[in-house]
């Protein structure tokens, strides 16, 4: 999204006069189940997030992972581990990428996870094989249980694409360190989920709506034109 994001974080870009991150958090707030929001930023964008957080009414912590560039970044999985270690987190986590929007409520995933009593992700049908090769792909059984998952597969085994929205049980959060030690892959959070699904049951909820991935200028302009908000 350069030059828009050269000196400005993508999650704070505006869609219909509201930052992407505000769309996500204001929706999640409706379930009244989240005790604290934690935003992990590199050092370069830290002050932007601090300014954004200044007038928020909910409990919010901004974490600086100490990195400056793409070349030195920790990767999403190590960022999550860094936050859990720094804040000594010992609770269930809802993990979301700040550059995606949904037209349905994320509280549906929370409710689904409470019903399944496992860590859970979401899935949607993707017919484009080339897009599947750039995403996390999860094959499931009749009960939505993940039976195979791979991040950016060369040969996708099914058409279920998994966007970066995850509900992790606290006991599974404790396995992140082990996953990193066993080289689960640390750039995309889906790499950890793929590893985790081979250790414990993980379910993948069929999405009841659409996801908008804001990856470049074209997709950003498209979202600004088409996004209608979250249907309840």
Per-region residue spans from a language model:
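A short, conserved beta-strand element in the Rossmann-like catalytic core
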Residues: 100-103, 211
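Residue-level signal for inorganic ion chemistry
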Residues: 21, 83, 99, 138, ...
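N-terminal nucleotide-binding beta1-loop-alpha1 segment
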Residues: 1-6, 12, 201
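Conserved donor-nucleotide/metal-binding helix-loop-beta segment in metal-dependent transferases, i.e.
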Residues: 104-133
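Conserved beta-strand termini and adjacent loop/short-helix elements that scaffold enzyme active sites
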Residues: 40, 63-66, 123, 152, ...
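Conserved N-terminal catalytic core of the sugar/cofactor nucleotidyltransferase
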Residues: 13-14, 18-96, 108
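Catalytic-core segments of class I nucleotidyltransferases/pyrophosphorylases
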Residues: 110-114, 145-213, 217-232
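Short acidic-glycine loop/turn motifs at beta-strand connectors
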Residues: 139-145
